């Protein structure tokens, strides 16, 4: 017994903050808490780091029992000496350990526990505590000083694992379901069941058939047997309830029965009516916009919309105002919500039914026609049972259902609305929106009629004058266009009325430079060239004067063809022509001093026999000269840096924060001078409080920089993806705006 091999294990005890997060398909780290313990750093008693619970168990023992007992014992100091009872033990995977245990492996086990209650936990020094998982993940990286390296690796893997589980139907509810022993209500043993193993040769039965029958009859006699059709099948079930009613008097003790007055029988029905009336009155008070839409009161509806009531608000039944208007056939109310309220015509209720479904169910042909005329309508939208509006109309056959069916059938044959997808040279392609404003980035990319090879280099961006965001494949660009004012307000201090968004086909910020260097397709090279030229002229490619002159001469060769001494004299490069080949920030300050050098290099390039004059070869040569520029291929964010102007005052410098596959770059917004360029591995970052700033620490010169920006959350998430801390296509970090 004493020589049993011990296995090192780590335990992640997690609990949800509330029950609603268990049924969400979207993973949010802030919905969970994790149990960590603080330990002092070696040789630094005052500095501490957080680690996961860890222990050693016998390799051949019952792991589940050992780990649950360890959690129970470890958590007694923080739960009034009662300990925390885990629901189950789930083995996630094994990890290689660092430090003294280098080369060894340790398993990470997940122990889910009950939803967080409102009782305050007792804090004891040296005991574990619960922390919000989102707060932990914000500062977690494999090089973070806040955690041991093993804990960092495990936390990053746990975050990714939880995100994956949220995409699997019923996985999260099953993880936090009560333990099997807690779900057993009654256990009845068959008295005829023989516990002893039957010996070969002779058949021995403990009871005769008559004795068995009499014993079973004495225990329980079933008059009717109904078999559960789900038993033994692979069908998933859910424990979701339709409605919960809590007795307000529960827990108040026994009532004084002498004071209870039973009303006369003729008043019983009236009392039930009163309860219903109270509920209806409460609904009217809480949701006036819903009531006015339900009744078709357009005058009140208009006033409420002017007063700022949201058309997206869902009531206690998870319906929005437009659902009531369509259900009850209120044409003018529906029109007002769509036009004045700018309501999404594809807005879903809690059961995933759309306004078009509600209008089709009721056979309200006029409303169906109104919705089908909306430019953003999704004609092919499906409800929770995968039924189209046409199907539900034919199933219910209400009111003018035949006319409604004709309208829906005609709509399926009509041409689709289109959206313009621009390229950086100003050209565009119109793409059909087969699903209205439910059309995703992935579907638009397929509609661009690009080859599979070309598609992998580019994606859809939404851009206005001062804000550009790369969208994720599952994002719905038309909905981003609709809510652009809100996005601009959330991410900047700009006036949203001055920002007009458009959709662009641009280079994917996640595209590795090694992959781009292998691109041979002329169309892909052209699109990459147009974007690189745009960035150069805007001043985003900060590099040496010599490099800028080389790029300018290449642009002259691409635009004007071979050098002609009669046409391309010194006066040829006036200010207007310079703007098409030189960064705008250099046109007035330096470009006039470069004209001779640019023309000389242009002439050399034209007469050089070693350089192909094929257009896509010249464009590729231009890209080759851009690849070693630090900021090439970066996504740019805006922010402010405070520097000391004197001992008592601070100077505010507005900066661009560039993030690409190379690292992070700070550029002066006014002068386009590159202040800082750090490669991954040479710096650390930390997201500030309320996502309002990001702190950057250079490992080489030990300097700290703080960039104040509303886009700090986006910057950190993109840094994590491009540095490899989270997978590029991982949805583990939920972000409603950008950078997939």
From Swiss-Prot:
Keywords assigned: Angiogenesis, ANK repeat, Cell junction, Cell membrane, Cytoplasm, Cytoskeleton, Developmental protein, Membrane, Repeat
PROSITE patterns: ANK_REP_REGION, ANK_REPEAT, FERM_3
Span list, region N-terminal domain similar to Nudix hydrolase domain: 1-168
Record's bilayer topology term: Peripheral membrane protein
SMART domains: ANK (SM00248), B41 (SM00295)
SUPFAM superfamilies referenced in this protein's UniProt entry, alphabetically: Ankyrin repeat, Second domain of FERM
Effect of residue 449 to E: Dilated heart phenotype
Domain FERM: residue ranges: 417-740
Compartment list: Cytoplasm, Cytoskeleton; Cell membrane; Cell junction
GO process terms (BP): angiogenesis; anterior/posterior axis specification; atrioventricular valve morphogenesis; blood vessel development; blood vessel lumenization; blood vessel morphogenesis; cell redox homeostasis; endocardial cell development
CDD domains per UniProt: FERM_B-lobe, FERM_C_CCM1
Stretches forming ANK repeats: 284-313, 317-347, 351-381, 385-416
GO cellular component: anchoring junction; cytoplasm; cytoskeleton; plasma membrane
UniProt note: phenotype after gene disruption: The heart chambers in mutant animals are huge, constituted of a monolayered myocardium lined by endocardium.
Role played: Component of the CCM signaling pathway which is a crucial regulator of heart and vessel formation and integrity. Negative regulator of angiogenesis. Inhibits endothelial proliferation, apoptosis, migration, lumen formation and sprouting angiogenesis in primary endothelial cells. Plays a role in integrin signaling. Plays an important role in the maintenance of the intracellular reactive oxygen species (ROS) homeostasis to prevent oxidative cellular damage.
Domain notes: The FERM domain mediates binding to rap1. The N-terminal domain has structural similarity to the nudix hydrolase domain, despite the absence of a nudix box and low sequence similarity with nudix hydrolase domains.
Protein name: Krev interaction trapped protein 1
Organism expressing this protein natively: Danio rerio (Zebrafish)
Lineage start: Eukaryota, Metazoa, Chordata, Craniata, Vertebrata
Gene: krit1
